[in-house]
């Protein structure tokens, strides 16, 4: 029913999804600035240490929140490995070697990998509009790669590292489906703690330099909001708004990040970057329209 899609829980879910997108989108250019000169493992460890504290502070023991079970352990380890270790490490390294706006826009491909994995592993239906949206996202990503390729090898490698981060987070999103009904605070704390511990150990083993107090506190705060609160809001939004629509709204995060990067003074955008951004925006809008129509048509009476 049309009325069902405008219910208060759905509206709340939509707002939570938008807030999650804004927090994560803003975090990307901030990580680029605060992480300048730091090792990628150190940056990732500080980000997820902040996220872990948010999870710990918001822990609930309410009866309506399903607690994590032993059977969730391997799924959590996978989420931490891909989403809280490989993803942020690849992003942190990439941000130091490529354009902040390009990196933000490239993160749009997370939606492509998430949707493709859902189709492959869970047999989710993907009609022609969804495939068209995915092709637009892919074409936009190719335009960004070409743009950074023209800037030089280092810029291209940085963007490819960001692409690796989107693959890692696509796997993370796929694994998180099985924990959507668990206490989101527990999920955030467990995933972030595992990721922070792993990347901190790697930072020490790699001999990365210690950050300044300002950089450490800044990255900790960005991790608390852009990764901890963002993930919590994302999981809560999935319950009321549906996984497909939540993912589609969250796909606007890269555009928020690109806008903030331009606000910080980045002016490296060429016509290929603008073309890539427009193609990706068209893909996200098409995917959002399809997701809304699909879930709308199947609303229970």
Q: What is the meaning of each model-derived region?
A:
Residues 55, 77, 117, 129-148, ...:
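Hydrophobic transmembrane alpha-helices of multi-pass small-molecule transport proteins
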Residues 34, 43, 47, 94, ...:
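Hydrophobic/aromatic residues within transmembrane alpha-helices
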Residues 23-28, 56-102, 107, 115, ...:
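Specific transmembrane alpha-helical segments of multi-pass solute transporters/efflux pumps
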Residues 23, 37-86, 113, 168-172, ...:
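Transmembrane alpha-helices of multi-pass small-molecule transport proteins
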Residues 20-21, 44-46, 88, 102-111, ...:
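Helix-helix packing/entry segments at the starts of transmembrane helices
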Residues 8-14, 37-45, 68-74, 146-166, ...:
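Juxtamembrane helix-entry segments on the extracytoplasmic side of multipass membrane proteins
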Residues 1-45, 51, 151-178, 301:
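Glycine-/small-residue-enriched transmembrane alpha-helix faces in small-molecule transporters
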Residues 17-18, 71-80, 126-138, 158-159, ...:
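Cytoplasmic-side transmembrane-helix entry/capping segments in multi-pass membrane proteins
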């Amino acid at each position: 029913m049309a009325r069902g899609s405008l219910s208060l829980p759905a509206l709340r879910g939509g707002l939570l999804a938008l807030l999650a997108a804004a927090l994560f989108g803003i975090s990307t250019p901030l990580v680029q600035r605060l992480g300048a000169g730091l090792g990628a493992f150190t940056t990732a460890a500080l980000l997820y240490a902040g996220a872990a504290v948010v999870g710990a502070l918001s822990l609930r023991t309410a009866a309506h929140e399903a607690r994590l079970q032993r059977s969730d352990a391997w799924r959590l380890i996978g989420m931490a490995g891909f989403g809280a270790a490989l993803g942020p490490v690849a992003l942190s390294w990439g941000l130091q070697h490529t354009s902040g706006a390009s990196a933000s826009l490239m993160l749009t491909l997370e939606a492509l990998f998430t949707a493709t994995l859902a189709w492959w592993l869970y047999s989710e239906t993907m009609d022609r509009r969804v495939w068209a949206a995915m092709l637009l996202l892919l074409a936009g990503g190719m335009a960004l790669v070409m743009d950074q390729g023209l800037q030089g090898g280092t810029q291209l490698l940085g963007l490819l590292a960001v692409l690796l981060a989107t693959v890692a987070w696509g796997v993370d999103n796929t694994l998180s489906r099985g924990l959507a009904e668990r206490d989101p605070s527990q999920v955030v704390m467990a995933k972030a703690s595992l990721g922070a511990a792993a990347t901190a150990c790697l930072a020490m083993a790699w001999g990365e330099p210690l950050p300044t107090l300002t950089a450490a506190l800044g990255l900790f705060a960005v991790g608390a909001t852009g990764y901890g609160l963002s993930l919590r809001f994302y999981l809560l939004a999935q319950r009321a708004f549906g996984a497909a629509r939540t993912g589609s709204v969250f796909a606007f995060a890269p555009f928020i990040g690109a806008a903030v990067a331009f606000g910080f003074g980045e002016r490296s955008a060429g016509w290929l970057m603008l073309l890539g951004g427009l193609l990706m925006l068209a893909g996200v809008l098409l995917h959002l329209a399809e997701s809304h129509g699909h879930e709308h048509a199947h609303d229970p009476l």
